[in-house]
Amino acid sequence: MADPVRLIVGLGNPGREYEDTRHNAGVWYVDALARRQGVFLTEDKKYFGLTATFSFEGETIRLLVPTTFMNRSGQATAALANFFKIPVTQILVAHDELDLPPGCARFKQGGGHGGHNGLRDIISRHGNSRDFYRLRLGIGHPGSADRVTPHVLSKPSKADRDLIDRAIDEAVHNTADMLRGDLNSAMNRLNGFKA
């Protein structure tokens, strides 16, 4: 068994102009998980984000959506994790993933930032530790590097958004395994899913 997850972070950019863009897929996941748990995210300036808590098998699980821009996501994550003494190995970060198509999602532990500025800042703010869990939510690749920024900062087509939402629903369904520290079960179940 791996470490159980105690903090779940959804990456994105703040503001209405970004809320429906691909780069906010991590926020969509945390929003869906909060709805499933019947909790509401509220602003907490101390942690530079929107937060909520719920109980799972007697443990407190914390949700966080940073209200900083993507490249400052580590500021919020570190503030909350440090205050509640949550080790980096008990953090799950949900983020958009160019290297997976819409409709795919994958849990993993560790790894680099892959050019993702939110992950880069989280790694930096946690003493260069890469040992947190990730939920990679596929948004597809636009085909060339010069089109990546416009791609992640634009809205997906209705068909792609439906696929992303179905993958998020499946990830939410399998989050309980992550909360128990059963990474292998969570990975096997989610890796077998394709919307």
Curated annotation (Swiss-Prot):
The active site is at H23. Transmembrane segments: none annotated. One of its GO terms (molecular function) is tRNA binding. Pfam families: Pept_tRNA_hydro. Monomer. Hydrolyzes ribosome-free peptidyl-tRNAs (with 1 or more amino acids incorporated), which drop off the ribosome during protein synthesis, or as a result of ribosome stalling. This is Peptidyl-tRNA hydrolase. The lineage of its organism: Bacteria, Pseudomonadati, Pseudomonadota, Gammaproteobacteria, Oceanospirillales. The gene is pth.
